[in-house]
């Protein structure tokens, strides 16, 4: 891998870090959860989920940032991902850098998405010196919209 393997962003309760092979089973379970994936086209298979995690790590290796694995600091339990992703040509407002998150449903409503996203925004503006970060979600996804509002987006 690369030097980015040891990089981590820490908050009071969370660690955002490079992906590890032992994250894949919990990530696959999260991506197979119909409740978590209800605003996406379909839940992911194990193979699709593993490929997504590998792609996230490749982006981190290439750029030094991306969608990081998120774990609880006190237990090192994987709870999902949060991070930044370049969207070069996908939208009318591209190129842009988006912030995104996806957490296991058992960790919802505890402030983890907001806490992790705040750390990512700090990284985006203070370290990467970005002028703007965007966020978007399905109109029906009120929980993600609430996180965006708490972030000032």
Regions from the language model: what does each represent?
Residues 20, 80, 113, 141, ...:
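Conserved phosphate-binding and hydrolysis motifs of nucleotide-dependent enzymes
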Residues 89, 140-142:
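Residue-level marker for beta-strand->alpha-helix junctions and adjacent short loops that shape enzyme
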Residues 101, 109-123, 142-150:
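Conserved acetyl-CoA-binding loop-helix of GNAT-fold acetyltransferases
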């Amino acid at each position: 891998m690369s030097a980015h393997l040891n990089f981590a962003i820490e908050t009071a309760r969370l660690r955002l870090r490079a992906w590890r092979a032992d994250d894949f089973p919990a990530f696959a379970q999260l991506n197979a959860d119909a409740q978590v994936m209800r605003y996406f086209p379909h839940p992911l298979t194990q193979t699709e989920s593993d490929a997504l995690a590998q792609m996230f790590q490749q982006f981190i290796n290439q750029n030094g940032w991306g969608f990081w694995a998120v774990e609880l600091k006190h237990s090192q339990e994987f709870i999902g991902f949060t991070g930044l992703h370049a969207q070069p040509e996908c939208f009318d407002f591209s190129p842009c850098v988006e912030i995104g998150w996806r957490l296991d449903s058992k960790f919802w409503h505890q402030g983890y998405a907001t806490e992790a996203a705040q750390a990512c925004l700090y990284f985006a503006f203070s370290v990467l010196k970005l002028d703007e970060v965007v966020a978007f979600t399905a109109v029906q996804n009120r929980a993600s919209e609430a996180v965006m509002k708490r972030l000032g987006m």
